[in-house]
């Protein structure tokens, strides 16, 4: 089948849910037996989000092939079976970089390089390249219609219909129908104006996804259809859901996937949404109640920084038929106030990744508390490194143990810069990134959780466990349960005399899905349940 293209745009406000809409539509089309791929186009000039502050951008999602990408790719992978790559996310910066490189090589034969056709053609090439082998390619255009930055992207997707025809392209516009409390009314004017902006560019949306906090009455759908020039059946309300995993079911109930395959002339089987119904049932009505897990981090004021992590913990709850309640604790606050009171009612503690010295001593204090009070502990990336620092200081009595990331003249750097990173000067795209194999020691907590000896997980870091301290740490009870054999790097550490204590250098959250929870999160949440019931 010739690949069909679905372009998803957003209007009125940012963060309107285009990524979730794209991911949910992908899940529905997969349920109909179609091969789906997804792609995110970002209008910013950065080459990728790898060097952007978590407070500005939120989480950086890492693919298996080592791309640092937008967090929406996390939604795509969690909701679908698509294996995404570097091709699945591109930015204005990447496009201009590529076009300028071609111009310097003389590829344009002395022509004047312009936004149209050169920039837009480059964008179209990247979209087509990513779509190879798929029945349907869902392409989300970042930003909001009306932004200057988005114009070249919108022009590129406009040309797709000219190039490929109406039967092979579809425009879905996500918009807002706000409720004005003082007037007691829903308002359609923002949606009308957003569609007007799209039509000025030359794009007539085929389907409108109308976000609202309340049900949209039929007469209002009729009004939107009339003023926006779409069939009333294609005005699809998307009322705020209790949980994001209900969105595919809500969109199916409104027959979004039915309208999409009809407009694209695709014959498919009826969708089987039983797995999604089971997920929603567990999330909304868990059989084993609730566990409370503390996330002790440094970016807690913007929880989007830990998006994949919070979702992976939810998946662990789904696997154990319980709800996971998260308490975000600022590690700097622990440094200022002390640990007392912060973790006393928690069933488990997780210390996530991060960069820089700020807040790290608070993380060490939280780890020591979890170790001494036998509370299940999970350390990821920097969290694993701080667990090694804590163990070296308080169990091995290496008082000045630290990471060379924070103290260059550190007397005992139990965590140090990786050898291949010592000659690196540029920040962007130069970390240890993507999937690497790891061998697990038989009988360890990690081995039991995975039920496998060989695994592969995704990484994003420059610093690693210092092998010079292997002997003293293992002699004092630290278990090195996961090793990257090619370079003899320690990837997983554990403690034996503890209910559940594990640190990993990789990011397991990037591979967890609601329909396939990650083994470590399943095991960790199970330990939290046991801890809760033992209290």
Swiss-Prot record:
UniProt entry keywords in alphabetical sequence: ATP-binding, Glutamine amidotransferase, Ligase, Magnesium, Metal-binding, Nucleotide-binding, Pyrimidine biosynthesis
InterPro entries: Class_I_gatase-like (IPR029062), CTP_synthase (IPR004468), CTP_synthase_N (IPR017456), GATASE (IPR017926), GATase1_CTP_Synthase (IPR033828), P-loop_NTPase (IPR027417)
SUPFAM superfamilies linked to this entry: Class I glutamine amidotransferase-like (SSF52317), P-loop containing nucleoside triphosphate hydrolases (SSF52540)
Binding-site positions, L-glutamine: 354, 382-385, 405, 462
TM regions (residue ranges): none
Positions with a binding annotation for UTP: 14, 187-192, 223
UniProt pathway: Pyrimidine metabolism; CTP biosynthesis via de novo pathway; CTP from UDP: step 2/2
Reactions catalysed, as given in the entry: UTP + L-glutamine + ATP + H2O = CTP + L-glutamate + ADP + phosphate + 2 H(+); L-glutamine + H2O = L-glutamate + NH4(+); UTP + NH4(+) + ATP = CTP + ADP + phosphate + 2 H(+)
Gene Ontology molecular function: ATP binding; CTP synthase activity; glutaminase activity; identical protein binding; metal ion binding
Activity regulation text: Allosterically activated by GTP, when glutamine is the substrate; GTP has no effect on the reaction when ammonia is the substrate. The allosteric effector GTP functions by stabilizing the protein conformation that binds the tetrahedral intermediate(s) formed during glutamine hydrolysis. Inhibited by the product CTP, via allosteric rather than competitive inhibition.
Active site: 381 (nucleophile), 507, 509
Recorded superkingdom: Bacteria
Membrane in keyword set: no
Sequence positions that bind Mg(2+): 72, 140
Annotated residues for binding of CTP: 14, 147-149, 187-192, 223
Residue ranges of the region described as Amidoligase domain: 1-266
Keyword Protease attributed: no
GO cellular component, as recorded: cytosol
EC number: 6.3.4.2
Residue pairs linked by disulfide bridges in the UniProt entry: none
EC main group: ligase
Record-linked HAMAP family: PyrG (MF_01227)
Family: Belongs to the CTP synthase family.
Note: CTPSs have evolved a hybrid strategy for distinguishing between UTP and CTP. The overlapping regions of the product feedback inhibitory and substrate sites recognize a common feature in both compounds, the triphosphate moiety. To differentiate isosteric substrate and product pyrimidine rings, an additional pocket far from the expected kinase/ligase catalytic site, specifically recognizes the cytosine and ribose portions of the product inhibitor.
NCBIfam families xrefs: PRK05380.1, PyrG
Name of the protein this chain belongs to: CTP synthase
């Amino acid at each position: 089948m010739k690949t069909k293209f679905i372009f998803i745009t957003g209007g009125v406000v940012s963060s309107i849910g285009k990524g979730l809409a794209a991911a949910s539509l992908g899940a529905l089309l997969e349920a109909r037996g179609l091969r789906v791929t997804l792609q995110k186009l970002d209008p910013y000039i950065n080459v990728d989000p790898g060097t952007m502050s978590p407070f500005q951008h939120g989480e950086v999602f890492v693919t298996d092939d080592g791309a640092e990408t937008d967090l929406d790719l996390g939604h795509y992978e969690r909701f679908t079976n698509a294996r995404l790559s570097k091709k699945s996310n591109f930015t204005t910066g990447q496009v201009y970089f590529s076009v300028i490189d071609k111009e310097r090589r003389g590829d344009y034969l002395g022509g004047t390089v312009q936004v149209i056709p050169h920039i837009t053609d480059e964008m179209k090439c990247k979209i087509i390249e990513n779509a190879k082998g798929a029945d349907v390619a869902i392409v989300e255009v970042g930003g909001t219609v009306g932004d200057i930055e988005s114009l070249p992207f919108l022009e590129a997707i406009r040309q797709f219909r000219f190039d490929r025809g109406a039967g092979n392209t579809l425009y879905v516009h996500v918009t807002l129908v706000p409720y004005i409390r003082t007037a007691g009314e829903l308002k359609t004017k923002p949606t009308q104006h957003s569609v007007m902006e799209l039509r000025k560019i030359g794009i007539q949306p085929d389907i409108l996804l109308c976000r609202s906090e309340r049900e949209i009455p039929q007469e209002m759908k009729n009004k939107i259809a009339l003023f926006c020039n779409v069939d009333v059946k294609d005005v699809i309300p998307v009322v705020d859901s209790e949980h994001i995993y209900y969105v595919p079911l809500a969109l199916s109930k409104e027959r979004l996937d039915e309208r999409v395959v009809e407009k694209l002339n695709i014959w498919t089987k009826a969708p089987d949404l039983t797995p999604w119904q089971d997920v929603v049932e567990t999330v909304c009505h868990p059989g084993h109640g609730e566990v409370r897990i503390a996330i002790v981090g440094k970016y807690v004021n913007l929880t989007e920084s830990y998006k994949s992590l919070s979702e992976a913990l939810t998946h662990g709850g789904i696997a154990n038929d319980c709800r996971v309640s998260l308490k975000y604790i600022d590690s700097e606050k622990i440094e200022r106030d002390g640990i007392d009171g912060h973790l006393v009612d928690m069933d488990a503690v997780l210390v996530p990744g991060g960069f820089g010295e700020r807040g790290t001593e608070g993380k060490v204090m939280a780890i020591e508390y979890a170790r001494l009070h036998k509370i299940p502990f999970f350390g990821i990336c920097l969290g694993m490194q701080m667990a090694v620092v804590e163990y070296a200081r308080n169990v091995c009595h290496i008082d000045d143990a630290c990471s060379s990331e924070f103290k260059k003249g550190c007397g005992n750097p139990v965590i140090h810069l990786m050898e291949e990173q010592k000659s690196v000067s540029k920040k962007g795209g130069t970390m240890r990134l993507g999937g690497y194999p790891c061998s697990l020691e038989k009988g360890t907590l990690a081995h039991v959780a995975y039920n496998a000896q060989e695994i592969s997980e995704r990484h994003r870091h420059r610093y690693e466990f210092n092998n010079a301290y292997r002997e003293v740490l293992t002699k004092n009870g630290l278990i090195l349960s996961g090793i990257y054999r090619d370079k003899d790097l320690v990837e997983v550490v554990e403690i034996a005399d503890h209910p559940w204590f594990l640190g990993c250098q990789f990011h397991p959250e990037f591979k967890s899905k609601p329909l396939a929870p990650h083994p470590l999160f399943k095991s960790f949440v199970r330990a939290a349940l046991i801890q809760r019931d033992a209290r």
